[in-house]
A protein has these predicted regions:
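Short, solvent-exposed turn/loop segments enriched in Gly/Ser/Thr/Pro and often Arg
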Residues: 32, 158, 202-203
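GST-like fold's C-terminal all-alpha helical module
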Residues: 100-193
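Terminal-tail/helix-coil boundary detector
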Residues: 200-212
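Short beta-strand(s) of the beta-wing in winged-helix/HTH DNA-binding folds
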Residues: 52-55, 151, 196
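GST-like domain detector, emphasizing the conserved glutathione-binding G-site
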Residues: 1-128, 142
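A local structural micro-motif
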Residues: 27, 80, 153, 197-198
Length: 212
């Protein structure tokens, strides 16, 4: 099983968290998204050119982070289960996963891309709108986490895989230390071995991306 990914891709980080949590072996293929030549080569292999991309041993391609995690959870049912067996609990996990992708990750990516532009070219409306959406998710997550260790309850799930990468980038632009439940959650998940491993591997690439 092969994974094509980039450490600077939050959706790749999301899948890596799932793989590391479940301790699933895979062959890594790092795609340099900063290289036009490498992106072009990857598009020859996968025309949509998006990472992460999981390729099974039989050659079948499985794209899109949430679909990859669903496949992993069904194929490797060992603990932790990223999607609960109970249908209602599973719907809740999928909803939270989707919300984190749309209302946290996407606006954070918009903020990052806008911040790379020379200051006179930055669109303040784009930044303000993205910051508003991120703030809304901060408040939602802070309230939602009350009485919960993780987003979907007391078990780590796909929803947490979706939340952790964009939260890392988001705090660069909008501090959430005053959102009590959210900060407590961040402190808690940051101690998980899978999270520590993923950030240890990704940090040099992320720092270079952010110009640190």
């Amino acid at each position: 099983m092969d994974l094509y990914f980039s450490y600077i891709s939050s959706y790749s980080q999301k899948v890596l968290l799932g793989l590391y949590e479940k301790n699933v072996a895979f062959t890594p293929h790092l795609v340099d998204l900063t290289s036009q030549e490498e992106r072009a080569r990857f598009r020859e292999f996968y025309p949509f050119g998006k990472v992460p991309l999981l390729v099974r041993d039989d050659g079948r391609m499985i794209p899109e982070s949430s679909i990859i995690l669903e496949y992993l959870d069904q194929t490797f049912p060992q603990s932790p289960r990223l999607i609960p067996a109970d249908q209602e609990d599973a719907r809740q996990v999928r909803l939270l996963d989707r919300m984190c992708d749309l209302y946290l990750n996407d606006p954070v990516v918009s903020m990052i891309l806008e911040s790379w532009k020379p200051e006179p070219q930055q669109d303040s409306e784009v930044m303000d709108k993205a910051a508003e959406r991120v703030g809304l998710m901060y408040r939602f997550l802070g309230d939602h986490l009350s009485g919960r260790d993780f987003l979907a309850g007391n078990q780590f799930t796909m929803a947490d895989c979706a939340a952790i990468p964009p939260l890392y980038f988001a705090k660069t632009f909008a501090d959430f230390s005053s959102v009590g439940q959210l900060q407590d959650y961040w402190d808690r998940v940051s101690q998980r071995p899978a999270v520590i491993r993923m950030w240890r591997e990704a940090e040099p690439y992320v720092r270079a991306l952010m110009g640190e």
